[in-house]
Amino acid sequence: MKFGKIVLLTNILLVPTASLAGGSHDHDHGNKAGSGLIETEFGKYDPQMHPTVTIEIRMSDDMKFTPATIQVKQGDIVEFIHANEGQLMHEFVLGTLQSLNDHADEMKQNPSMSHDKPFMVHVAPGETGTNTWQFTESGVFHFGCLIPGHYEAGMRGTVIVGS
């Protein structure tokens, strides 16, 4: 009977510990260990790739990204480092203009929706987040903070991918 009590006590002690392991969700939805290969019309993510370019982007409560225009070459693997210098939560979502507009509309309906793709990063106030993305096609692509009200206030930018 002692063995049964020890197992029960161990399970009671481990359950709260396990729940604390995921405790404070920092909303960094960048390079997820479980993310596999993802390909889109604006590029791809592969967990095996290594950055060839690093770009720092500052996010602010005046609803701006700095820089708001980024130039890269087709094939570049970019590590984005996002610094939220404001007091509000901000996010960085890459996409086409249409995909960003669609996602912004979805966010109005469900502002707490999950962001689990490697082209999306939530960054808490005063924090830094990262994500890595390869631009496989030349063209003009977009990014924005799709938290309701931010995108509409002008928190958006452009990625120009040259060949």
Please identify what each model-predicted range represents:
Residues 108-116:
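Short beta-strand and strand-turn-strand segments in soluble, beta-rich domains
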Residues 98-109:
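Short aromatic-acidic-glycine turn motif
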Residues 22-35, 64, 117-163:
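Extracellular/periplasmic metallocenter environments
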Residues 26-50:
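N-terminal pre-domain segments of enzymes
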Residues 42, 46-77:
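N-terminal edge beta-strand
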Residues 57, 68-94, 129-137:
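Beta-strand cores of secreted/periplasmic/IMS beta-sandwich domains, seen most often
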Residues 16-18:
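N-terminal signal peptide c-region/cleavage motif recognized by signal peptidases
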Residues 1-8:
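Bacterial N-terminal signal peptides that target proteins for export
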